């Protein structure tokens, strides 16, 4: 029910779908499949790979051990990656449950978006160079690796009092399963950009009737959606629902792009002599 793949220092977005295909085939035969990948690079959106299992009426999981950029709780040195985890489960009439989140206080890309949009980071997202959480809005840090950034991401939770030990523990879990278990080390070791990946597929039919599972998922999702919202909020949503609704809207109205992204595409197309079209 297991396999291990050498990523050949290539993009994880290429090899991870293949790894999930292998995990799915193993799950069809024995109920569960787990595949690890070492010596790889960025795998893109973790939930993309987890959702491949959903397409086969299975529960999918994907996690990736990333290069360091996040402080451990009580730490002043970034020794852990953002280490995202994605889990996806099918439903019947409702959209799939899809959880996909970095185990840092905020995803690394949010820092780049803040720089691009000229906005500040919220309190508890980053710490200064001595590891003290910055509990006020602050400009996004200057990019850098191995100690050269101007500030560092905190674990999910921000401070120990607000539960950063939980985010810290989850990052460690990903380093173990998506790093050490792959045989390829972890973010800090071997000292170069190093990604390890872990994918798993759970065949629902090996545990219970698939139709009953999906029916109960609908019931559970409806329970969440129908629960009472807090003041200032219209409704309660479940993980994956906002993204599902965004796909529907953008399929009709198009995808909004920041002008810097458009300029980047123009420049790259010009360098490579590729026609540029924007519709």
What positions do the PLM features span?
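Phosphate/diphosphate-binding glycine-rich loops and adjacent basic-rich segments that engage nucleotide
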Residues: 70-145
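Glycine-rich phosphate/pyrophosphate-binding loops
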Residues: 57-69, 174-193
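Secondary-shell segments that build the walls of catalytic and ion/ligand-binding clefts
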Residues: 119-186
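General beta-strand structural signal in soluble alpha/beta enzymes
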Residues: 5-7, 28, 34-39, 60-64, ...
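A glycine-rich phosphate/pyrophosphate-binding beta-strand-loop-alpha-helix module
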Residues: 17, 21, 25-65, 71
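Catalytic-core signal marking the mid-to-C-terminal active-site face
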Residues: 176-179, 186-279
